[in-house]
Amino acid sequence: LSLHDALPILPLMSKEKIEKALAFHKSFPQYSETPLAELNHMAAYLGLNDFFVKDESYRFGLNAFKVLGGSFAMANYIAEKLKKDVSELTYDELTSDQLRSAFGQATFFTATDGNHGRGVAWAANKLGQKSVVLMPKGSTQTRKENIEKEGATVTIEEVNYDECVRMANKMAEETENGVMVQDTAWDGYEKIPTWIMQ
C-alpha cells in the first residue's frame, strides 16, 4: 500500500494538512531541513537498495522532532480562536503586535518526561506565550533545566506520568486562557492531539 493509496483512509493526515504543517514550520526563522543518513549496511542486511533515516537531532536546536507537533497544535489553537485557518498564520504573524492585541496571551500546559515538554516550552517562548510543564517523579534535573531554559515554569511532581497529565489538565482548566497541549488523547480531548500528530 503506497502513501498515496493510504491517504484516503487517513483523513487526519491528508496531503493538504501535511502541507499546512510543513508551511507553518518553514515560516520559523530557525527552520532548516534535517538531514537523511544513508545506512548502506542496514540496506544490504535487509535486502534493500537503499535505507535512510531522518536525523531529527538537528531540529530547531532541540535534539528532537517533538517540537513540531506541539508548535503546530499551538498555532492551530490560536488560529481557531481568531477564526482563521492555520495556513493564514506564519511565524511572523503569530509573533506580531497585531496578533498579541487580537489574541492576548495563553498559558500552554503539558506533562512530559522530556522532549514533548521542551518542545512546547520552546514554541510558547518563540510565539510570545507562556508554558507550564509538569514532570513525573524520577525525571532528571538536567531535563527539567533544559525545559526551564526554554522559558517554561517547570515542576517535578511526586506522582507518575499519568497523574501529571491529569494535574496539568486540571491546572489548564482552572487557569484563565489555559490550554492543555498533550500528546495523548482521551475521551473529549482529541483535537489538540490530532494537531500534534499532523
Regions found by a protein language model. Give the residues of each.
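PLP-dependent amino-acid enzyme catalytic core
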Residues: 1-198
